[in-house]
């Protein structure tokens, strides 16, 4: 339903983004809204159980962030000494994380109002894949509401656990840094069992309108391309509509599927003689 470059070429999308940015500049209640998201409504439900694991959507040209732009929290398995010492002493990762903490210490030190402060202090949370499933209980609903600060899953090394063998504890700083760079520069989505997806595509005062449009098109291309499965190609039944918004703004349309337009395309194709 949405062909390649439809969004970039769409005058409606550009107008909507200009109007949205103007809203945020003029409306005092929106002055702190910086993230720009698209809301994608699909023809069919995705049929994927929500697991609270963000999936990366590669952006071809315009990065969202660099690791140094963000305050990043790393949550490790216990004990955390190996990971903390390796990452803080290695030149590739010494300034990558604002804090490194184990699950046990996280549970012990942060409760109630301290969890709220933790939420405010960090822009991004990443966790060792071996403890990621424990975090909804430890971090609480604040981090998981609206998917704004869901922890990303990373691996501390390329080591793979073999059956009946204990996994050797290793920490590879270069591999950790590569994962962080990918998380920061690209965008992501959370699979669900609904027919609606929200994806961040830009940041006010950081990305221009043409850059945001390109990021939107990259997102649509990835989510509709079946060759990108299982990470991509998750949209079923085509795209019905796309809206753009910030956290507190109204939703502005940038794409609406037109059955009449689709029928016209089919009629045009039927006139072609082979």
Curated annotation (Swiss-Prot):
Any one of the GO BP annotations: ribosomal small subunit biogenesis
Major location category of this protein: nucleus
Pfam families from the UniProt entry: Ribosomal_L1
Location relative to the cell: Nucleus, Nucleolus
A GO term, aspect molecular function: RNA binding
Record keywords: Nucleus, Ribosome biogenesis, rRNA processing
Keyword Cell cycle tagged: no
GO annotations of cellular component type: 90S preribosome; nucleolus; nucleus; small-subunit processome
Protein function: Involved in rRNA-processing and ribosome biosynthesis.
Quaternary assembly: Component of the 90S pre-ribosomes. Interacts with FAF1.
Family: Belongs to the universal ribosomal protein uL1 family. Highly divergent.
Protein known as: Ribosome biogenesis protein UTP30
Organism placement in taxonomy: Eukaryota, Fungi, Dikarya, Ascomycota, Saccharomycotina
């Amino acid at each position: 339903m949405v062909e390649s470059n439809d969004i970039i070429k769409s005058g409606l999308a550009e107008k909507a983004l200009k109007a949205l940015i103007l809203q945020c500049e003029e409306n005092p209640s929106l002055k702190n809204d910086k993230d720009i998201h698209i809301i994608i409504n699909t023809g069919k439900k995705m049929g994927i159980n929500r697991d609270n694991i963000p999936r990366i959507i590669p952006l071809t040209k315009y990065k969202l962030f660099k690791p140094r732009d963000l305050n990043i929290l790393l949550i490790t398995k216990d004990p955390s000494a190996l990971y903390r010492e390796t990452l803080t002493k290695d030149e590739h990762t010494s300034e990558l994380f604002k804090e490194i903490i184990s699950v046990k210490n996280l549970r012990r030190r942060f409760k109630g109002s301290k969890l709220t402060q933790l939420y405010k202090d960090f822009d991004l949370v990443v966790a060792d894949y071996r403890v990621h499933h424990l975090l909804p209980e430890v971090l609480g609903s604040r981090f998981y509401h609206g998917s704004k600060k869901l922890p990303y899953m990373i691996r501390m090394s390329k080591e793979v656990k073999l059956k009946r063998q204990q996994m050797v504890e290793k920490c590879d700083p270069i591999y950790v840094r590569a994962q962080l760079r990918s998380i920061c520069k690209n965008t992501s989505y959370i699979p669900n069992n609904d027919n609606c997806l929200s994806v961040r595509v830009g940041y006010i005062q950081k990305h221009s309108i043409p850059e945001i449009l390109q990021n939107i098109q990259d997102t649509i291309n990835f989510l509709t391309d079946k060759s990108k499965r299982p990470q991509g190609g998750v949209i079923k039944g085509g795209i019905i509509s796309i809206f753009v918004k910030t956290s507190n703004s109204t939703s502005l349309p940038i794409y609406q599927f037109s059955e009449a337009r689709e029928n016209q395309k089919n009629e045009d194709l039927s006139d072609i003689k082979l």
